[in-house]
Amino acid sequence: MSITLGEKACRWGLCLGLVLWVGREGILCYAAADDAAVPSAEFSGSLVKTVKGRQYHAQVFAKGDRLRLEYKYAIRTERGYAAIEIIRLDKSETWYLLAQQKELLVTGLSQDDLFPIRPALPGERDRILVGDATAAGRATQLFEVQTDRHGRVERFYEWVDLDTGVVLKLVSRDREWSFEYERFRLSPQPAYYFEEPPGYNKRMATTGP
């Protein structure tokens, strides 16, 4: 199974134009590209997203404002297939590693490229604390959150890790959509996970992110 780059943001990424909210399939991907506080915790985890009974998986590695996603199924880009994506918020760029071509395909980071780290959701209008809960075996606070993106209202349950502020689980109350960490581990991440691989040529994408 492969996923085109154009579809990736909808299937694997929580497209914050909010294609995510439009109900397209994939792993939620909303890494804040703005200046709001991004949790500085370093961690790795296994993400699973369920859409209408179908599941999608990815491994995630985070180090401050740098993220690495290793997909179970490759993403088809304009230059070939990529199983690894690196999100560099500090550069406002997304990199796709094309192993066969030894190329690093670079796209700009748009507001539609988000990752499940911080609690604030795009278009958030209301947030109510429900109480204490658990997710991924960790203590969390459970919130009811309502968003409104371009007139589309959606309600969510959101589990936020008490220690790190990272979103560990997000469930839509209005459609068959959920995301959660099956595994979440706080641990130092090697810097090279988020750098340009040696021997790769950098190439700018001709299409948008």
What are these regions (language model features)?
Residues 2, 9, 13-67, 188, ...:
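N-terminal leader/targeting segments and the immediate start of mature chains
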Residues 51, 135-136:
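Structural motif
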Residues 53-56, 118-130, 179:
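A short, amphipathic edge element
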Residues 59-117, 172-183:
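An acidic-aromatic
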Residues 73-85, 136-201:
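Gly/Pro-enriched, hydrophobic low-complexity segments
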Residues 114-116, 125-131, 140-146:
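Extended, positively charged loop/linker patches that create polyanion-binding surfaces
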